[in-house]
């Protein structure tokens, strides 16, 4: 692992994998190399995604693993990441094997909490937005339960940068959960951003400017 960044609820971990003896593996185009699967094992519930990107100039394969922990108690713990089967986009398995890497997760969470109290219209009624928690890698909004409101109809539609880019178009994970007292919706971005570059969050078609 070469870099880790996270907040109270999720994290990105970037791995560098050096590929040696490419000639022996008969790899003609190193841009075509990827892992068939990369998955995370922790003691806590986790969801997320991953992607790989080979940069020819530096001779390494990078695997970025995103994780949404569904809990705020994972940091300062450890987890395992398994890389399975080195493959080629030519539908060829170059090496059929699993490689497991263990890592201690220890980072300083960076996030900003914005209290709201705004009323959000939802099919069937209204509910109240308690607040938005935003970080360089994710956004999270929590709502109080409204009367006669179908809470499952609440969702984050867009996270818009000042440049006009919508981070929802490239989000890597997201989800929601409802309980007796309300609902929480979250979205993990596909890249790291500066919080000050985020202009607004749109929830159920209603835009909240930050």
Regions flagged by a language model, labelled:
Residues 1-210:
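Alpha-helical, hydrophobic structural elements that either
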